[in-house]
UniProtKB/Swiss-Prot annotation:
Species the sequence originates in: Bacillus mycoides (strain KBAB4) (Bacillus weihenstephanensis)
Protein name (database record): Ribose-5-phosphate isomerase A
Catalytic activity: aldehydo-D-ribose 5-phosphate = D-ribulose 5-phosphate
Superkingdom, taxonomy of origin: Bacteria
InterPro entries, per database record: NagB/RpiA_transferase-like, Ribose5P_isomerase_typA_subgr, Ribose5P_isomerase_type_A
Amino acid sequence: MMNLKQLAGEYAAGFVRDGMTIGLGTGSTVYWTIQKLGHRVQEGLSIQAVPTSKETEVLAKQLSIPLISLNEIDILDLTIDGADEINNDLQLIKGGGGALLREKIVATSSKELIIIADESKLVSHLGTFPLPIEIISFSWKQTEKRIQSLGCETHLRMKDSRPFITDNGNLIIDCIFPNKILNPNDTHTELKMITGVVETGLFINMKSKAIIGTKNGIKEY
């Protein structure tokens, strides 16, 4: 069976041109973009990249992709990243890999955001996939209760029987909204007003395009 993630990831690498400074997302689909870019760098492509996670940083270094800090530049030409859900308005849920804060910082520092995914990530309404929320660890139970007051079911993300810790030293609360997320803008705003919430996995109002791997080939949105 065709690997639809690989199809989308490698296709998106074609948007990267010589001399660009780009953002590299995190996850199983972007993995294929980074692999493709590594091959192109070996063939002479000259780029600089900002990784959105330690995982991506390690992979990029293994492939000899030159890395820089976001502090060294004003704006990125392009960021390529994956998504856990994509609705008809190209609003996203991201953060399944736990890198949502750095992913959002990099995405909002880019002229253009290309989202890559397989067709299973397309939805009419966001919210079937749990919405990740990054929170500080201090008094996290109080923050969780305030999040629950918005009508969602919450779970502290775990890894190896311990709380999952982000690259920023924070925790992740995964939230299920029983009636889906019908107004992502309002939900994002309400969550960000809760003290202790650092960032949400809702990526909205961004200049983006989506590259979707389907059984019939690539579709662009």
